[in-house]
Amino acid sequence: MHTVKLLCVVFSCLCAVAWASSNSQPCHSPPLTSGTMKVVSTGGHDLASGEFSYDSKANKFRFVEDTAHANKSSYMDVLIHFEEGVLYEIDSKNESCKKETLQFRKHLMEIPPDATHESEIYMGSPSVTEQGLRVRLWNGKLPELHAHYSLSTTSCGCLPVSGSYYGDKKDLLFSFFGVETEVDDPQVFVPPAYCEGVTFEEAPDDHSFFDLFHD
């Protein structure tokens, strides 16, 4: 028990040192993260809820919507290779695939390098053990989309907690739950074989990650 407490103290100290030396520069996500992502509109409409996987080194993202989330005729399964500017919309049931160009490559899984650090706060209680979470708040603009965003990440670890996107056409709220620093199956970042040979569909220059979520 004493060993566990000592490790917690050491870990907290290391986090404090890392925070002090960061000079409020944008932190970087762990190499691999996975968990549940929920997206709603500011009007309160549920837009999507499902499992995400993110590879920060290769900048690849997979999101598979929970089929039990809502009464829908189709469910989202997308794979995005941001560095390559490719978005795959996958239909595993019918083994079909749609492949689009993605010119705009910023997203909420990674803090943009030009983000502004707003503050550091505690959610919950800072004085009661395991009853609080220290987070850092970031914000910035996406002029190409005529939009702005805000993000909150854990102070130590840079795990996503929540995010918001405010644009001319839509406002979105993102929440992240049960985030782990691993991905069970690395193959989630590999497009299925039936996506090979599919012709690219050209998309507008402002086509983005945020266009995936709509009523």
Each language-model region and where it sits:
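N-terminal leader/targeting segments and the immediate start of mature chains
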Residues: 1-60, 71, 94-95, 125-128, ...
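Intrinsically disordered, low-complexity boundary segments flanking structured domains
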Residues: 20-25, 103-108, 123-125, 163
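Gly/Pro-enriched, hydrophobic low-complexity segments
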Residues: 131-198
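Short, solvent-exposed coil/turn segments at beta-strand boundaries
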Residues: 29-33, 53-62, 78-86, 131-133, ...
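Intrinsically disordered, low-complexity segments enriched in polar/charged residues with Gly/Pro
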Residues: 38-41, 66-67, 74-76, 125, ...
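An acidic-aromatic
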Residues: 49-115, 165-175
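Acidic, glycine-rich loop-and-strand cores that form catalytic or ligand-binding grooves
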Residues: 106-134
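Disulfide-rich extracellular modules and peptides
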Residues: 29, 89, 99-101, 158-160, ...
